Amino acid sequence: MPRSGTFTRPYGCVRTPCHSGRVLQGDMQMGLFSQDITSMDDLYMHTLQDIYYAENQIVKALPKMIKKASNVDLKSGLSGHLEESRNHVARLEQAFGMLGCEVKAVNCPAIDGILKEADEVTGDIASAGVLDAAIAAAAQAVEHYEITRYGTLIAWSKELGHVDVAELLEQTLTEEYAADDKLTALAEARLNMAA
């Protein structure tokens, strides 16, 4: 059973904005504390759109990490996760469809910041071993962000009556935990000592 989010307060029977006839637009710039988020439905859809944006940014960023990595196991693990991330994008598109919503993304400053920091930290490292350790740490920061988002979305999906969406997202959460565990094992067994 995958671990899930900590948001368990019941919100009653609420329909998502899509079911109430309101579609959130992709160019809408909602912040977490935005006045545009006035209900649990709004927050749920914003978070779904947020992780959709994040997964797409991760798909764009992973090839650069793979290219910089020198450790064969790290390259292989990141390459495998790139394929998984592409599947995560497809699953999110499926979730939007299950909710009857148009696929939309909202900017996610959190993932932008994590990826920017990863790029900056790994940009000027001359030692291949240190660079691999930095890449693994950056990839884990990404994994941890994804784990929090998917755990929360699973809990909220269940609370809002979208059990089918929760089950779909649980597949992704399981893969995110597995990727994080592999990165931890690799870092502890090889990368950190080689650095």
Language-model segments: residues:
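Amphipathic alpha-helical hairpins
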Residues: 13-195
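Extreme N-terminal basic, low-complexity initiation segments
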Residues: 2-6
